[in-house]
């Protein structure tokens, strides 16, 4: 460079795109060389007429493409030189900064610095640190380190400082420093503290740290800046060229900074990368017009620009070269059988093959670049993202794949093996392809899944088809029996849980025996499905159901369940038209044809029962699901319920089912049913099936996660078949309850989750129940089935509509249910009697184990006894005994089969054991039902009437019915008990779903965001469903309500029965107190009347659905109160219960996580007291009635 020319001092300190950053530059001022480095302050005049100002050099860089030497500086003016002028607020040492930094070419900046600044008199005259002071103690090194770390932002300025020292700049007279106001204040403070000390103390590290400034210059001037202003004329200065400002932020700014870069980034792949900015800008259009992506060769562009060829000619030449290169490259690569199909992206822009090739050749080719590790330079030339950490590798691999073969070809090195990295390159490509295929495959899978779901909804799988056909038969039969659209809602609800199960279980089933078209086959399929579902866990079912809920695909899985449910449905139909209808009507509603297929299959049902016993787990689950659907309201009822309980998604699903059931097969409705159940609640915290599954699995343990949405059966879930048999036994008695509970459960998504967990189990139980009762159902008139499903639908409708009009029609069914319910309730009544509670608990526990073992073995016997019980409704006690006997036998079978399941938590309160509990309860109920059932029957009849009057018109299952008059109620309980057990099992499984239906019952529930606020009927239904299995005591209420239900059958049968039972229980027992505690756990009316007063209608606990489920779900004994607590007067009085509810509602039991509640209070209590599972529900049922 010439003596006066500018030159960089020191090594570059940064590289970014086309910019090379430096720390200092040297120029000649008044004939003497001077070095300005980053952070230096110096006087400048922007124009000869402008006032003197201070410039802070902040950035120095060279733009490689245009060879521009640029600087960025911040200017400081005295207050009087600003438009506003100086005022009293300005300090004597204050300067004001220009808000915008100025970009100035170095030559112009040097011109600005050439001026006379002797007139500057402002600033604090600081005492310079004498250089001699630095000689001692290495203070100079310390000061240099301080300046490097603090003043120079950590950049290594040693070389610059050395240059400055060589020039003697340390002694520069004109040295100005502008501090921030805080720095200035600290500096002044330090000066004051060391005013009597030598200036060398400022070099002390502590003095420096405390704000001291060691100034080396002879005449330092300290100023501070705390404000900025907009300079009016600075923009007009010709020297200021902001257009050259470096683009350093965000994505490749280089493109913006450098016209070439911009062109290349703009995707025109300018050929002008190396051309001067002007040339580049002019050539942009051409480059962009160029079809080829590659940028022009930098070298060629530079040469042309340097040669000052016409800009257009330069651009054209670059473009021509680029075109020729691209043509040759593409041709060669195509001939080489490695055509270039897609140009990859580097950073944020597509690779310009021409630019990449030119840059590589410029640096010596592939071998040289790789040896020197200069691929990052190529990446920079391509304008890649500066922040990329894999730029070099990616660039090299792209080059190896796209250009290296051609480069070798040009150099005659074709035979030279390509770098070993190329395979990696290919691998990357293959990986990309694989990723693409994976992505597309995932999409396909998702789409296929969706299609499968839709197909399931619309066209069941082979197994599903058989199931659908059976379901269609079922539906046809149910429709024939019911001749009402009620089944539609219930099937929807049912279908939803089933949909989940079917989705999860159906696939397995289809694999297992997709071709099985017989109901028996379907039962086995359902069993397999249930087992697979259990193995797979509820998660798959739950996840898939969410999709089906709105779709009919979920219903199709439901259809698979429906066939399973249909056997039990048929059994239920035999036992009670209502249960049958409940299970069947879903299929009817959903498929309409499935039932007819079932009717066709009915004859095989007996043989199917055996097959189903094996298949029961799935069948029970499907049955439970179907049961949910079976608790169908007439389409009118459903609509009414939907209207009444907008909160209940299940109701919505019922509406959907109404449409779909009428329009489509039950399979379609299943998904819908399930999802509405899962999402039915207006709960703000609706959980996804997976989340619910996780929550449930946490609550109930691994078994819960396996396939019981309810959670209490989790252990049984893993052994679904055993559970299914067990559930069949308990499901027979609980079947009616569970079906009713299914209705209510439908209205609660949270309940549904539990129900789904238990639903498999419930389906299994149902299946076994259906197997047991298949003959009854088969033998029973279609009217019975219709009546039952209608009755359950009515219960649903009643629970939502609180209708009493159809109770007469329901009475018979209710009686049947009441009988079945009464069996369990008497047992529960014993629980509730303080003397009986412990003995009953022990008996129940004993029966549970015995019955579990005997359940499966005795399933046929149970079916026979169940059939006998249903057939001999006139002899409720006999039925009860038979049912219990069969229950015990089946329980034993189940226990044998479920030994493993029993190994799992045997909490009677747990859903899995609820079946066992039911049987145990039934056994206890048998023993205690004689006196207590009569007692409970009368009590519950009265209570059920009252509760009916309140909200639940007919009290089917009041946990407290145990003490009711035993004979008639017992007959109801016994004849209905198998049904009740089924209902209970059904409700256990549907416990989650059931609360929803209950909530649908009452407007309060509808308004309530949390299931806890389920109407008393809802709770009653839930309790009836869930508790009924454990406590048939409501059977008398059922009986009483059964009559009303007969009339309410289509409108309020289920609701009434449940409500009645709950009411009876509340009145007849101390249990009512529990109701206030967990509104979701207790009958809706209680919660509505008692809790609603305490809990906002919209109150929704995060665990609300779980709580609701607990009401229905054995998994969570909502208030698993100790039997002692139950016996005590704690829950005796409604007022006490209300208070207790307040406290409990306020307390953690409800507030705490469902798992906590379960594990802390429910499981221990459940484990200790099988009653606990029932007491809370019963209590809730009782108390709501009392409140009512």
From Swiss-Prot:
SUPFAM superfamilies: ARID-like
Keyword Secreted listed: no
Post-translational modification summary for this protein: Methylation at Lys-337 prevents DNA-binding. Demethylation by PHF2 promotes recruitment of the PHF2-ARID5B complex to promoters.
Residue stretches of biased makeup (Polar residues): 265-275, 594-609
One GO CC term on file: nucleus
Domain (ARID): residue spans on this chain: 319-411
Molecular function terms from GO: transcription cis-regulatory region binding; transcription coactivator activity
Tissue localization of expression: Widely expressed. Expressed in lung, heart, small intestine, kidney, muscle and brain. Also expressed in spleen, thymus, endocrine organs and in uterus and testis.
A Pfam family annotated for this UniProt entry: ARID
Keyword line: Activator, DNA-binding, Isopeptide bond, Methylation, Nucleus, Phosphoprotein, Transcription, Transcription regulation, Ubl conjugation
Main location group: nucleus
Phenotype caused by lack of the gene: High rate of neonatal mortality. Embryonic growth or birth weight are not effected, while lipid accumulation is severely reduced in brown adipose neonates at 24 hours of age. Mice weigh significantly less than controls from postnatal day 5 onward. Adult mice are lean, with significant reductions in brown and white adipose tissues, and in the percentage of body fat. Mice are also resistant to weight gains and obesity when maintained on high-fat diets.
Positions of region (Disordered): 251-278, 413-614, 958-978, 1030-1066
Modified-residue entries (N6,N6-dimethyllysine), positions: 337
Protein induction: During smooth muscle cell differentiation in vitro. Upon adipogenesis.
InterPro entries assigned: ARID/SWI1_ChromRemod, ARID5B_ARID/BRIGHT_DNA-bd, ARID_dom, ARID_dom_sf
Sites of Phosphoserine modification: 264, 1032, 1133
Disulfide-bonded cysteines: none
Similarity comment text for this entry: Belongs to the ARID5B family.
Domain free text: The ARID domain mediates the interaction with DNA.
Biological function: Transcription coactivator that binds to the 5'-AATA[CT]-3' core sequence and plays a key role in adipogenesis and liver development. Acts by forming a complex with phosphorylated PHF2, which mediates demethylation at Lys-337, leading to target the PHF2-ARID5B complex to target promoters, where PHF2 mediates demethylation of dimethylated 'Lys-9' of histone H3 (H3K9me2), followed by transcription activation of target genes. The PHF2-ARID5B complex acts as a coactivator of HNF4A in liver.
Name of the protein described by the UniProt record: AT-rich interactive domain-containing protein 5B
Species in which this protein is naturally found: Mus musculus
């Amino acid at each position: 460079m010439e003596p006066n020319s500018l030159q960089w001092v020191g090594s570059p300190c940064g590289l970014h795109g086309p910019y090379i950053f430096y720390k200092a530059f040297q120029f000649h001022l008044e004939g003497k060389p001077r070095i300005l480095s980053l952070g230096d302050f110096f006087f400048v005049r922007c124009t000869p007429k402008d006032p003197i100002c201070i410039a802070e050099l902040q950035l120095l860089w060279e733009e490689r493409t245009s060879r521009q030497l640029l600087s960025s500086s911040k200017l400081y003016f005295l207050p009087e030189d600003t438009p506003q002028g100086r005022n009293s607020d300005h300090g004597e040492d204050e300067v004001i900064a220009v808000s915008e930094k100025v970009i100035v070419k170095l030559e112009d900046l040097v011109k600005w610095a050439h001026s006379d600044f002797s007139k500057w008199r402002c600033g604090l005259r600081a005492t310079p640190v004498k250089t001699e002071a630095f000689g001692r103690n290495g203070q100079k090194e310390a000061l240099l380190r301080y300046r490097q770390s603090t003043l120079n932002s950590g950049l290594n300025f040693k070389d610059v400082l050395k240059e400055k020292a060589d020039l003697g700049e340390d002694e520069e007279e004109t040295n100005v420093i502008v501090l921030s106001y805080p720095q200035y204040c600290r500096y002044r403070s330090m000066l004051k503290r060391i005013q009597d000390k030598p200036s060398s103390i400022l070099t002390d590290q502590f003095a420096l740290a405390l704000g001291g400034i060691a100034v080396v210059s002879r005449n330092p001037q300290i100023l501070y800046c705390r404000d900025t202003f907009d300079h009016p004329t600075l923009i007009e200065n010709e020297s200021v060229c902001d257009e050259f400002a470096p683009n350093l932020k965000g994505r490749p700014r280089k493109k913006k900074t450098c016209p070439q870069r911009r062109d290349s980034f703009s995707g025109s792949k300018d050929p002008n990368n190396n051309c001067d900015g002007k040339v580049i800008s002019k050539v942009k259009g051409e480059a962009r017009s160029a079809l080829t992506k590659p940028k022009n060769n930098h070298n060629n562009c530079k040469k042309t620009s340097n040669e000052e060829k016409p800009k257009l000619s330069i651009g054209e030449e670059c473009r021509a070269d680029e075109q020729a290169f691209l043509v040759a490259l593409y041709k060669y690569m195509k001939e080489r059988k490695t055509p270039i199909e897609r140009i990859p992206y580097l950073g944020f822009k597509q690779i310009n093959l021409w630019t990449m090739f030119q840059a590589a050749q410029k640096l010596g080719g592939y071998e040289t670049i790789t040896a020197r590790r200069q691929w990052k330079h190529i990446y920079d030339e391509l304008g890649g993202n500066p922040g990329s950490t894999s730029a070099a590798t990616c660039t090299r691999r792209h080059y190896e794949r796209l250009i290296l073969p051609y480069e070798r070809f040009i150099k005659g090195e074709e035979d030279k093996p390509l770098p070993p990295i190329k395979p990696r390159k290919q691998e990357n490509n293959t990986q990309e392809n694989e990723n693409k295929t994976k992505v597309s495959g995932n999409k396909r899978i998702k789409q296929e899944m969706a299609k499968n779901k839709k197909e399931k909804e619309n066209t069941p799988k082979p197994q599903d088809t058989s199931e659908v056909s059976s379901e269609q038969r079922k539906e046809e039969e149910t429709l024939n029996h019911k001749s009402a659209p009620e089944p539609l809602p219930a099937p929807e609800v049912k279908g939803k849980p089933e949909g989940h199960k079917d989705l999860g279980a159906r696939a397995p089933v289809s694999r297992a025996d997709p071709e099985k078209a017989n109901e028996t086959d379907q039962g086995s399929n359902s069993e397999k499905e249930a087992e697979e579902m259990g193995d797979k866990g509820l998660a798959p079912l739950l996840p898939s159901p969410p999709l089906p809920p709105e779709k009919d695909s979920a219903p199709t899985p439901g259809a698979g369940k429906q066939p399973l449910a249909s056997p039990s449905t048929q059994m239920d139909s035999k036992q009670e038209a209502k249960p049958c209808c409940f299970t069947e009507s879903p299929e009817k509603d959903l498929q309409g044809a499935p039932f007819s297929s079932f009717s066709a299959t009915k004859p095989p049902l007996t043989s199917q029962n055996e097959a189903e016993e094996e298949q029961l787990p799935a069948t029970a689950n499907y049955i439970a699901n179907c049961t949910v659907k079976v608790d169908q309201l007439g389409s009118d009822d459903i609509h009414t319920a939907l209207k009444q309980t907008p909160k209940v998604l299940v109701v919505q699903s019922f509406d959907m089912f109404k449409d779909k059931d009428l329009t489509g097969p039950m399979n379609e409705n299943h998904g819908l049913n399930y999802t509405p159940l899962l999402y039915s609640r207006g709960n703000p915290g609706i959980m996804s099936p997976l989340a619910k599954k996780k929550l449930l699995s946490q609550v109930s343990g691994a078994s819960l996660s396996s396939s019981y949405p309810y959670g209490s059966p989790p252990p049984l879930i893993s052994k679904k078949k055993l559970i299914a048999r067990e559930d069949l036994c308990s499901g027979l008695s609980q079947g009616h309850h569970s079906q009713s509970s299914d209705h209510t459960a439908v209205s609660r998504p949270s309940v549904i989750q539990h129900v789904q967990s238990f639903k498999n189990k419930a389906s299994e139980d149902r299946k076994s129940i259906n197997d047991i009762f298949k003959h009854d159902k088969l033998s029973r008139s279609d009217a019975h089935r219709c009546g039952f499903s209608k009755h359950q639908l009515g219960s649903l409708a009643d629970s939502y509509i609180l209708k009493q009009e159809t109770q007469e029609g329901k009475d018979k069914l209710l009686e049947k249910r009441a009988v079945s319910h009464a069996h369990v309730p008497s047992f529960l009544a014993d629980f509730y009697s303080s003397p009986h509670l412990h003995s009953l608990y022990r008996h129940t526990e004993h029966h549970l184990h015995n019955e579990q073992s005997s359940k499966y073995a005795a399933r046929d016997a149970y079916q026979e006894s169940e059939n006998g019980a249903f057939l001999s409704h006139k002899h409720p006690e006999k039925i009860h005994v038979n049912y219990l006997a069969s229950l015990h036998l089946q329980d034993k079978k189940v226990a044998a089969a479920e030994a493993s399941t029993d190994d799992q938590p045997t909490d009677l309160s747990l859903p899995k054991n609820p079946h066992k509990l039911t049987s145990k309860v039934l056994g206890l109920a048998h023993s205690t039902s004689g006196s207590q059932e009569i007692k409970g029957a009368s009590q519950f009849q009265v209570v059920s009437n009252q509760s009916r009057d309140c909200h639940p018109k007919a009290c089917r299952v009041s946990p407290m019915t145990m003490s009711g008059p035993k004979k008639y109620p017992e007959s109801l309980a016994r004849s209905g008990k198998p049904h009740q057990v089924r209902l209970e099992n059904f409700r256990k499984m549907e416990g989650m779903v059931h609360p929803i239906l209950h909530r649908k019952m009452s407007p309060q529930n509808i308004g309530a965001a949390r299931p806890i606020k389920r109407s008393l009927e809802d709770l009653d239904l839930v309790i009836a469903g869930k508790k009924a299995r454990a406590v048939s005591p409501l059977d008398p209420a059922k009986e009483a309500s059964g009559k009303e239900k007969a009339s309410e059958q289509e409108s309020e049968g289920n609701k009434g029965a449940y409500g009645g039972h709950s009411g009876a229980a509340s009145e007849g027992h101390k249990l009512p107190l529990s109701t206030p505690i967990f509104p979701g756990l207790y009958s809706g009316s209680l919660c509505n009347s008692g809790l609603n007063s305490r809990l906002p209608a919209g109150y929704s606990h995060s665990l609300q659905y779980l709580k609701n489920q607990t009401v229905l779900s054995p998994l969570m004994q909502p208030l698993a109160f100790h039997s002692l607590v139950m016996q005590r007067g704690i829950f005796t009085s409604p007022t006490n219960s209300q208070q207790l509810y307040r406290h409990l509602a306020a307390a953690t039991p409800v507030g705490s996580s469902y798992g906590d509640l379960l594990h802390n209070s429910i499981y221990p209590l459940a484990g200790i007291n099988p009653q606990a599972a029932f007491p809370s529900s019963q209590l809730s049922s009782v108390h709501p009635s009392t409140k009512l």
